[in-house]
């Protein structure tokens, strides 16, 4: 009998941990030319937001994003599901609604059979179906490692659009998914994942961030982004720096997957964690190693990081509960201090 194919053995990176580090990305973008200042471009790359938004008229904008990566799990169908869920998330993070997607596929055709790639596409299509959008086409290339993702188009009302740099002092921070995706998937790749933890990370990575569309319609939601490859601290630095504020994070209140402390102690910390910290660690007040290993953990298809005004909290929590989310605050935003983020 043939051994089952383990997709993670065919790639050097995994999921959003494949991202080029913020520090290196700065070097790449610094010499790439200035962005065209089109007044219809409501959101571009200046704030490192989740997606671009271009005006259709005075009230509506088209939301455009793309995301792709190498396998973070061995099962091809699940890889397709995770990659698609992660890509569509950027539309929800802007407060928008997805309209359609096209696939991006890189495949080592001389190494892995096309039937495996078909399962990846099937997984991606299943998620598009769940999101209520067509997978309308795509593009494929022969590549040395498997790569899959989507380019997604959505729409948003200008009054409901949520950016990552518009929070105000006094806002309360919420996170809709637990941290630890990178830690548990690293443990799985090293064959150290305990039986009781099997499937935990996969199930969270396959959970669509559809609540973002509802949160976008709440006036009390001042800013929103999704937590992906740069870890919670990386995306929180972007949110705080962009608004000229400091985020004060309550480490004990941050949701985390069961067993993360065990796996950190076992050395199951992905390489992206340290790359993340090296990129933005100077913007963060002193951390313990344990705090760094969790808070800089690269998330794939992570949750929404939401900044909510105090007067909008009750409505926000009511909507979250209606959507099946039991959320607790993880920190606050305050006037700028020495660092962009403080952890206590």
Swiss-Prot record:
Record-level GO BP terms: selenocysteine biosynthetic process
Enzyme Commission code: 2.7.9.3
MF terms in GO: ATP binding; magnesium ion binding; selenide, water dikinase activity
Keyword set includes Membrane: no
Binding positions (ATP): 19, 47-49, 67, 90, 138-140
UniProt catalytic activity: hydrogenselenide + ATP + H2O = selenophosphate + AMP + phosphate + 2 H(+)
Cysteine-cysteine disulfides: none
Quaternary state and interactors: Homodimer.
Homology family: Belongs to the selenophosphate synthase 1 family. Class I subfamily.
HAMAP family for the chain: SelD
Protein name: Selenide, water dikinase
Organismal lineage: Bacteria, Pseudomonadati, Pseudomonadota, Gammaproteobacteria, Pseudomonadales
